[in-house]
Amino acid sequence: MVKLSIVLTPQFLSHDQGQLTKELQQHVKSVTCPCEYLRKVINTLADHHHRGTDFGGSPWLHVIIAFPTSYKVVITLWIVYLWVSLLKTIFWSRNGHDGSTDVQQRAWRSNRRRQEGLRSICMHTKKRVSSFRGNKIGLKDVITLRRHVETKVRAKIRKRKVTTKINHHDKINGKRKTARKQKMFQRAQELRRRAEDYHKCKIPPSARKALCNWVRMAAAEHRHSSGLPYWPYLTAETLKNRMGHQPPPPTQQHSITDNSLSLKTPPECLLTPLPPSADDNLKTPPECVLTPLPPSADDNLKTPPECVLTPLPPSADDNLKTPPECLLTPLPPSADDNLKTPPECLLTPLPPSALPSAPPSADDNLKTRAECLLHPLPPSADDNLKTPSERQLTPLPPSAPPSADDNIKTPAERLRGPLPPSADDNLKTPSERQLTPLPPSAPPSADDNIKTPAERLRGPLPPSADDNLKTPSERQLTPLPPSAPPSADDNIKTPAERLRGPLPPSADDNLKTPSERQLTALPPSADDNIKTPAERLRGPLPPSADDNLKTPSERQLTPLPPSAPPSADDNIKTPAFHPQRMIISRHLPSVSSLPFHPQLHPQQMIISRHLPSVCGGRFHPQQMIISRHLPSVSSLPFHPQLHPQQMIISRHLPSVCGGRFHPQRMIISRHLPSVSSLPFHPQLHPQQMIISRHLPSVCGGRFHPQQMIISRHLPSVSSLPFHPQLHPQQMIISRHLPSVCGGRFHPQRMIISRHLPSVSSLPFHPQLHPQQMIISRHLPSVCGERLRGPLPPSADDNLKTPSERQLTPLPPSAPPSADDNIKTPAERLRGPLPPSADDNLKTPSERQLTPLPPSAPPSADDNIKTPAERLRGPLPPSADDNLKTPSERQLTPLPPSAPPSADDNIKTPAERLRGPLPPSADDNLKTPPLATQEAEAEKPRKPKRQRAAEMEPPPEPKRRRVGDVEPSRKPKRRRAADVEPSSPEPKRRRVGDVEPSRKPKRRRAADVEPSSPEPKRRRVGDVEPSRKPKRRRAADVEPSLPEPKRRRLS
């Protein structure tokens, strides 16, 4: 027999009934006894146990289970009722209600004194329970047993957290937990427990108010002594919420420890304030001091300044110890006020003082701040030297007569009146002084132009012989006095924008004149092509045999004018023009050869209404010429880094020749008859354009990307090469563009016109953006490039000429041959090539980007070939339009060609054909044989699905103003019925439109003629095996037939 003893300790009995059952089942898992009896035993144990101290581990109950070897179960349970009764008595006497305070314990004792059989109320659950003899242990804590255990564990964890937090704080600050802090922590715990009791309504109503008062005072005292947060009107509920979760009730051991605190200070005794103590001033917060404290010697140190509502008595050291904001009245005068008193306190003027015994000293201006003086100081001899600049905000008193060195010592901007003249003014006077007009001085000498800046003189200077040598460039911003009669070379020697009248001629002008002079035409010279920049020449150079070798590429952008023989050192000695200089004139007829500076501000401009002539002017970037009547603007080189808002705005600009425009430059004109030789920089901003209403001729202009010519009347635009990296919004918009000759267009450029009878020699790039276009309503003629002066022919042009030179057209050469399409780029030909028999073989695909020569009269299907939105009237019909014209080229009519053949669909990409090609005898040789070629030829060709990049979207209509619209030339909107399509789209027929006679009738069985015998089903034996086709092997196939290769789209 095996004896098993189970010791029921308080830790074991602290579990609830279900957990006790599980643990006992684990211990007696091998016992073969009825489960009902074992459950009864466990329930009895659970009903009779109670938490408390274990008596040195001595057993309360012994469960003795005997196991006989013969597998007969004899279970003997000895329950000593005396031990159970003793445990009940001990539990009730030592811990009648765990976690309660003295008030709760007294209430519990009163309930215990009731007789058995009565009903009582549990203090935790507020439920009525029975208290008859023999069942007193299970009446109180069976239901709330687990809640007590969780509350106890939570209290321990919270206490550990608070202690850890305080210790961590002290550890960071280099402190340890002292006995004083431990005492404060215990008092805080007691405060939380009392708040818990008040929250649960466990205190009688008669003691609640006193407890609330005690909580408030204890919180205030705790805050003052510990520095923790304090709320003056803290209630128990608010305190509980601020302290976190519901605090647990104290355990028996803790309540025994802290009973002394609760017994020493009952809540009923805290109805009156505590007696005063010596350390009240330290522990009481300053908010409780509603009356001022009596004066003390150390008030200034210990009392905050906001509590002092009345001014303090004067003291000798007030200026040092008292803050200036507390002084509501001015202080008495003192000798050292200027040194020790800060300037903020001098809000009121100082009282008048006695007359000084000593005269003013030289250091008075140093000690007194100038802003604190409401009246000027007496004059002093050394004011100009020792007085700071702030003092001179007030006018100075009259002083001694000025001396010769006054201009050096006194700044000119602080003088209200002009100074007397002096002999050395021009040498010693700073530049700031000349902001005011100068008094009349001695007659000017020859070196006045050097010493005095010209822009600060209100009157003109007399002429001088050495002006060109010694005068700085700033002087030329003011007009010169009248001089000798002008000569022919005045425009060369002096910049025109700085002269109201021409200067007299001089013999040494060619040597000593700045480089602005060279902006006008020079005399011809043999070495012009090397030494003279091409942008400053107005006429073409004479022909030379070595032009292709020695001429730089920049020269061929503009035609060179004939000029006088230049000097060799002209380009070296010319100074540059200042960037932020403007010429504002109403009558300026001509602006030529204007170079601009790269770092000019965008708002710097030349504003002129009438600009008749500005020669040799070198303009800087971000300079604008705004003119209403500007007849001629020639040789205008612009800098490439120009701001996009920099432009030349003109209403009447008849001729702009040889102008070299840089990026971010616009010419906006209403009447601009000719704009020639305008090279643009490739990195131009998309908003840079030439806007003109009347631009009859633009010749030889080299346009770079992001440049636009917007014109209503643009008769001729020739020689316009565009850069391949053009922005999609860059375009040439014209309503009347009669002639565009020799234009070399790069990708992202289109010419969209409604009436475009002829556009020749316009090669387009295959990678053109859909939004790049030249929009024109009237473009009657676009033919080959025009030249002002063609170059002489040369045999080695194609070999030795650099690529830049070919931006201009070549001179006429020998008659064209049959292979010209291969050797010469098509875009550089002025006229169409003669037909050739081997065009289909030798001509590269780029050739087909140029239009063909004029063809036969137009046909009826032209509306299909040309987009309808770009035509005001239909083009003349042509028989072979559908065959050989590429899609890009169909903006212009095609010339007549040979009749189409049947194999054109194979040789030509389908997207460029509107109709089939004529058959050819050598199709079988050039085209790889396909097994299904005949079948595919009979089937209708499947249209190819176009990509988004290949489709040409309709041009976005530009918003026009009312004044720009010409009602007479406004195209009429054509309806769908007006367009005559060559292949009409089949209409959808209705049921009523179909002829019922053509509808095949369904034949019935009776209508079938029985004379035709029904085919009989044949058997396998009836089939002739000899007629079955045999499967050929690889060896049987004839190798003579080449295997068809897979063709690519290209």
Swiss-Prot record:
Listed GO CC annotations: membrane; nuclear envelope
Subcellular location: Membrane
Pfam families in alphabetical order: NPB13-l_MII_rpt (PF20885), NPIP (PF06409)
UniProt xrefs under InterPro entries: NPB13-like_MII_rpt, NPIP, NPIP_N
Keywords from the named record: Membrane, Transmembrane, Transmembrane helix
Biased composition annotated in UniProt, kind: Pro residues: 349-359
Biased segments, Polar residues type: 252-262
Primary location class: membrane
Top-level division of the source organism's lineage: Eukaryota
Membrane-spanning ranges: 63-87
Topology term for the membrane: Single-pass membrane protein
Region (Disordered), start-end ranges: 241-262, 290-574, 785-1050
Biased amino acid composition, Basic and acidic residues: 406-416, 448-458, 490-500, 528-538, 820-830, 862-872, 904-914
Family membership noted in the UniProt record: Belongs to the NPIP family.
Name by which UniProt lists this protein: Nuclear pore complex-interacting protein family member B3
Species for this entry: Homo sapiens
Protein's gene: NPIPB3
